[in-house]
Amino acid sequence: MVKILKNLLYQLNKGKHGNIMNEAFWSEPQLIIELREILRDKRYFIVIDDIWDYSVWETIRYALIENGNGSKIITTTRNAHVANQIGGVYSLIPLSLIHSRKLFHQRIYGDEDKSLPSHLAEVSDIILNKCGGIPLAIITIAGILASKKGMTHEYWSKVSRSMGTGLEDSPQIQKMRRILSLSYYDLPPHLKTCLLYLGLFPEDHDITREYLIWKWVGEAFVRKEHGKSLYEVGENYLDELISKGMVKPVEFDGCSKATTCRVHDMVLDLITSLSNDEHFLTAVGGQQLMPLPSKVRRLSLQTGNAEDVRLLSTVSFTHVRSVTVFDQALNLLPGISCFPVLRALDLSDCEQVDNHRFKGICKLFHLRYLCLRRTSVTEVPKQIGNLQFLQVLDISLTEVKVLPSTFVQLTQLVYLNVSAWTRLPDGFGKLECLQNFPGITVSYPSMLHDLGRLTELRNLKIIKFIQCGENYDEPFLECLSNLVSLEKLEVNYYLGGPDFGLSSSLSPGPQRVYSIDMLRSTFYAVPRWMSSLSCLSALEITIRTLAVQDFEVLGKIPSLTDLYVWVLEPTGERPERLAIDSRYPFRCLSVFRFWSYGMEVVFSRGAMPNLQTLDLDFQVRKTKDLGGNFYFGLENLPLLQRVPVKIDCYCTEPGEVEAAEAALQKGVDMNPNKPMLNILKYGEMG
């Protein structure tokens, strides 16, 4: 910090402080006082480049006095979290292909308007696409290609193929790596490990969030933190790598959370270089340019050509702890007996993996992670019980119909993913460490007793209930009462009885649950016990008919921000629309999606004071029959911003659709916040 403040003083007043960098007597408070004195009556414009920590900014901000003279400060940072803390963020977007070409040509020829020879045009665009619009990458690669030998198509193609897999160690590449490595060396040790691990994926490979995090867990990269599941901790790791710009998000969910990510080619090049230096991970395939080490700890098999076979023949597998095989490289995988200390094995999408190979895998007694997703496995051998250290198991999208009784010996499992048709053995409640169970079919009520014993469950998805005339209500409620750690619940194809929601609370109940999705199930009413779930922020539910009591329950859920209600049958005997007003607090609700054949609600003054998005779907004919008009009270929602509406025009009389549209438009026009209305009509007769 002292060095930064000295540098500021030197640049602001070289006449007085020309030798300040060599003066040892300055303390941080003295430097701050001197800076404030120099700037006291000045109008200044200062750029602080590459801030890594918010505490550094706080000190600098205090030193740069606010004197009311219209001064400006610009800071740059690679850390999105730091940027958000400082405020006033302007996010730079990557250069377009056109501007990338201009920068590229400027570096090659010294003239941005000069064009490349025709034989280099196509390969240059491939190179620029790999640079991803990042100026540093473009300048670095252009510096390599600007050499005399660089003007040949053969050489440019070689550079293009090598990007992301260990580029040649030219001075330009070394300089770029040094710049990028600043971000790497700023990471804490556990994030360095997680980042280097991404070198196992091929270039431009899309990586799903959940898949990556559970691989980290299986590799023991994720540290336990009090009050958090291993998956939550892993999510924080990934979010931090994205925030620091080391991982690029590709796809997002409705909450703007990255569901798929990718490693930029230039970062992958850095990872490959560092990984080779530290003997962290060895990737076989792609454009591998370096000889393989004699000993390997983590192995990624990406392609299976003859050269790769030759390379692997020189490798010892006795120290390999992790193997990931991509489908086209399965022929490279030697016998399982070659990996005596293997802890993680990923054969997902390798269709040639069958039952015989699975039986051999059950001899890998040190395994912590096993993924056989989308393979040709149809049976789980009884020897599966030998894998006493197994924490992560994924056998989803296979033809496995039943798990053996020995499966319940896997008492260290924290993640289990099976196909919808896979039947669990009796006593699976012994898997008491299980935290994530993203797919179970409940075939009979007694299964819910075992499910209720999994008190560490954070994430549960019930794919379906096989009814067979059984009444699941009582055992299901008892099960939910016992799942005290549950945070996310999805229940599909459940037909709740009339008594399912009568209890006002579940004791002790899933008090930590923040998301419940019951949209593909059906209930007579909103269960009363939901109002006792203090952490519940997102709820999707389908009910048969709508009653005042439903909004009394929903309105009392204190943290509810996102609500989706689907009503199957409109209440024909109701004389007027159900008014939502200040009696139903909905203090935090920001998104309300309401689907019903007939629009049964009207918003009164004081309703949903923080609502920003109102998503409606209704049938014009039924709505007109129920209420006689299309007035919904949209002007009474003070913070409303968006009103997407789907209108079913089936069986409408002339003018009714236009009347509905006009009423909706009038409602938003009367709203002081002037929300945006978007109407989509369907079911119109030609």
For each predicted feature, which ranges?
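Post-nucleotide-binding-loop coupling segment downstream of the phosphate-binding loop, primarily
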Residues: 1-34, 214-216
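Alpha-helical sensor/transducer elements of the RecA-like P-loop NTPase core
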Residues: 2-9, 71-122, 140, 158, ...
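A conserved switch/coupling segment of P-loop NTPase cores
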Residues: 28-95
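Surface-exposed helical/coil interface segments that assemble multiprotein signaling complexes
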Residues: 65-67, 115, 144-194, 199-363, ...
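A short helix-loop-helix "switch/interaction" segment in the helical subdomain of ASCE P-loop NTPases
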Residues: 121-133
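The conserved phosphate-sensing helix
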Residues: 130-140, 188-193
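Structural position within Leucine-Rich Repeats
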Residues: 260, 303, 327, 344, ...
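Non-core capping and flanking segments associated with repeat-based/extracellular domains
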Residues: 433-438, 450-463, 469-686
